């Protein structure tokens, strides 16, 4: 049987928490608000299924351009090309 080519292939390490971070993620992370123009780091929280972006962009840094429902629109540069991702706040971390 041929191997799958779905969007989650090769994510064993990307979508696994370290032992300290296992279990339920903090609820305040899921309701975090970000301002337009604020820089955020994209980091998938494996314990939250909804509002994820494609794992290819895990580890990127982008800029919040707006809101879409409960999620945020994030502008990133990928290979010299501007792209817009939509992700919920559970998968975003503010840049200090």
Swiss-Prot record:
The keyword Ribosomal protein applies. Keywords: Ribonucleoprotein, Ribosomal protein. Residues 11-23 have a biased composition (Basic and acidic residues). GO terms for molecular function: structural constituent of ribosome. PROSITE patterns: RIBOSOMAL_L21E (PS01171). InterPro entries: Ribosomal_eL21, Ribosomal_eL21_arc, Ribosomal_eL21_CS, Ribosomal_eL21_sf, Translation_prot_SH3-like_sf. Gene3D superfamilies: Ribosomal protein L21. Transmembrane segments: none annotated. Residues 1-37 are annotated as: Disordered. GO terms for cellular component: ribonucleoprotein complex; ribosome. It holds the Pfam family Ribosomal_L21e. GO terms for biological process: translation. Belongs to the eukaryotic ribosomal protein eL21 family. This is Large ribosomal subunit protein eL21. It comes from Haloquadratum walsbyi (strain DSM 16790 / HBSQ001). The lineage of its organism: Archaea, Methanobacteriati, Methanobacteriota, Stenosarchaea group, Halobacteria.
């Amino acid at each position: 049987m041929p191997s799958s080519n779905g969007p989650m292939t090769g994510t064993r390490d990307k979508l696994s928490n370290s032992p300290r971070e296992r279990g339920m993620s903090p609820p305040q992370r899921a309701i975090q608000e970000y301002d337009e123009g604020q820089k955020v780091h994209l980091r998938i929280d494996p314990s939250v299924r909804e509002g994820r972006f494609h794992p290819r962009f895990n580890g990127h840094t982008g800029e919040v351009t707006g809101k879409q429902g409960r999620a945020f629109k994030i502008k990133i540069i990928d290979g010299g090309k501007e792209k817009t991702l939509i992700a919920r706040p559970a998968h975003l971390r503010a840049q200090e």
